[in-house]
Every structure is written in C-alpha cells, then in structure tokens.
C-alpha cells in the first residue's frame, strides 16, 4: 500500500511538472488545445460521477452550457469578478439541473437517457428563444477573467499563458475534489445503487436522494467547465452544446472506461492526442470515432483502463499454455 501511494505521488508530481513546463515548450496552438483538454477533463470526470449510480445523462453538455451562459452574463452585465462568477455559475447550473431532475428522477436506464436528451434540448432551445441569451448568435466579447485582491495584487488572464495556468489550477482543484468524493463512502453507496438497487433499498438507502446528489454534484462541475470554456473562447452560442458534443463525451467515457476515476481521464487524453492526427480525415472524423467506439466495445468492453489487466491475463494464459 505504501509503495503504491509513493508511486502515485511521484507520478502526479512528474505530471504536474510536465504541465507547468509544457507551455514554454510548445506553440500557442498547443497551449489552446491544452486549455480545451483541461475543460474536457472536468466535463468527463463529472459525467462519470453521475454514471456511478447507473444514470447516463445527455443533459450534461447543455448544463455545462448553462454554466457558460451564466458566467458570461454575470461578467458582461453585472461585472462580477471571476472568483464569484465561477462558483455561482456552477450553482446556477445545479439549480437548473434540479428542476430538470423533477420529471427525470422517475425514470431509469434507457428512459432516463432519452428523457435527459429531451429536457437538455429544451434548455438549449430556450437560449435561442430568449433574447437575454443572444439567440442564435449567442454572447460575444466575453471579457477575460481578472483576479484582484484590493491592496495586494491584481492578476490579468487576458493572455493565453496566464489563462493556461489558471485553467490548470482550477482543473486540479476540481479533479481533487471529485477524487476525494470517489474515495469516500458516498461513492460506495452510488455504486451499490447501480449494482444492487433492491439490496441497497432494503438496508435503508435513500436511492432517489443519492441519485439526485450524484447528478447535482456532477452538474456543478460541468457548470465550472462551462465558465472556463466561455472565457477561453470569448464567445458562446447554443450550437456549441448540441447533441453531437454530448455524443463525443459518451465516446470518451466508453472508450476510456467508467468503472474507475481514471477511466474518463484516459479517454479524454487518448482522443486529445490522436484527435489531432485524425483531423486529416476531415468530414469522415465521426466515422473514425464510431469505428474506435465499436472496436473498444468488442475488444475492451471495460475501456482502455482495463488494457493492462487484459494484457497481463493474456500473457499469463500464453505462458501457461507454453508450459503445458
């Protein structure tokens, strides 16, 4: 156990060191990609949190959009500072998610999946209809965040390099919070609801309450991801949060695996690296993504996170066969 913890600490320290020096090695293009990568990490890991109870939600991306719109409006119309808009936008997304859950919580499995798409799409279409959200054009000229403590300092994140480090810090904090939750007793209850709902109910577990909790916590972090994305892009519109984006999120999760905390991180990292190479396929990229998904479902149903165990099993089987 001690050796595992030591290796984990060393690995994390090496990774953080790499991420700190990365923007000084690569061009601005790759720094921008890294910021998108950080946002996608928060989005994917928060989505996986919801799946621990057995619920797969296509409303996750629209709720991310709710956080993005809230952060943009608070910045442009109210002039609120970033450190206030960031958590508030997450809370607004959470409250909207709670309203959406009222009809959804009565559904399970496939019905929940389809119902979440319908309600998420209704939310997205409301941004087109309501003028405060800018209609089809969305909201432009979203100011870069600044962090100011009167009498001490003012940090401006209008340049890509400072914003990279801001996004990195927020991502690390969000992932750490979700990791601690994943290691807690609460997530064990989430998994029990997924694996043995009747048994969990028989021992007094409030299944509805814990499903709501998982959904709301995941939605909060999705809202945070939306704020980071809005400030990075400087523009948001309803088309950024369409079904296609939600399907890509599902592919990241399924290919990476969602049984453990590490799975979605592996999935997002895989597509962040190979996604750039796949750009040569142009309009055929969705087909390539589909082929990767089918291959993963056929040969790695538990995702890329299960690859080391699977290879170890095959090597042992081959070794045993050779000895016999």
Where are these regions (language model features)?
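Cytosolic-side transmembrane-helix boundaries in multi-pass membrane proteins
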Residues: 1-18, 138-140, 195-209, 278-324
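Membrane-interfacial amphipathic/re-entrant helices at transmembrane-helix boundaries
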Residues: 1-41, 81-85, 322-324
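Single transmembrane alpha-helix segments in multi-pass membrane proteins
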Residues: 23-77, 103-112, 257-261
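Residue-level recognition of pore/gate-forming positions within transmembrane alpha-helices
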Residues: 36, 40-41, 64-69, 90-94, ...
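Alpha-helical transmembrane segments within multi-pass membrane transporters and channels
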Residues: 78-121, 266-268
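Extracellular/periplasmic helix-loop junction at the C-terminal end of a transmembrane helix
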Residues: 119-156, 302-307
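Helix-loop-helix "hairpin" substructures at the membrane interface of multi-pass membrane proteins
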Residues: 156-237
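Transmembrane alpha-helical segments in multi-pass inner-membrane proteins
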Residues: 211-295, 299
């Amino acid at each position: 156990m001690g050796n595992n913890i030591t290796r984990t600490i060393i690995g994390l320290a090496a990774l953080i060191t790499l991420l700190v020096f990365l923007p000084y090695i690569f061009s601005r293009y790759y720094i921008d990609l890294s910021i998108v990568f950080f946002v996608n990490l928060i989005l994917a890991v928060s989505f996986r949190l919801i799946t621990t109870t057995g619920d797969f939600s296509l409303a996750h991306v629209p709720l991310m959009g709710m956080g993005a719109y809230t952060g943009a409006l608070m910045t442009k119309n109210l002039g609120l500072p970033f450190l206030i808009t960031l958590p508030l936008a997450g809370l607004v997304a959470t409250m909207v998610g709670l309203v959406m859950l009222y009809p959804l919580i009565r559904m399970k499995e496939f019905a929940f999946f389809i119902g979440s798409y319908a309600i998420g799409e209704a939310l997205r279409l409301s941004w087109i209809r309501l003028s405060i959200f800018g209609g089809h054009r969305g909201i432009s000229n979203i100011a870069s965040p600044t962090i100011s403590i009167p009498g001490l300092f003012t940090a401006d994140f209008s340049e890509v390099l400072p914003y990279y480090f801001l996004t990195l810090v927020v991502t690390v904090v969000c992932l750490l919070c979700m990791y601690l939750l994943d290691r807690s007793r609460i997530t064990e209850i989430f998994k029990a609801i997924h694996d043995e709902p009747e048994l969990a109910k028989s021992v007094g577990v409030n299944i509805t309450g814990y499903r709501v909790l998982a959904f709301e916590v995941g939605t909060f972090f999705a809202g945070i991801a939306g704020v980071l994305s809005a400030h990075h892009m400087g523009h948001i519109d309803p088309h950024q949060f369409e079904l296609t984006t939600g399907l890509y999120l599902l592919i990241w999760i399924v290919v990476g695996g969602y049984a453990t905390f590490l799975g979605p991180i592996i999935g997002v990292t895989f597509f962040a690296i190979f996604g750039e190479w796949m750009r040569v396929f142009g309009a055929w990229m969705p087909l390539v993504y589909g082929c990767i998904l089918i291959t993963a479902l056929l040969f790695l149903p538990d995702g890329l996170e299960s690859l080391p165990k699977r290879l170890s099993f095959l090597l042992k089987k081959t070794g045993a066969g050779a000895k016999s």
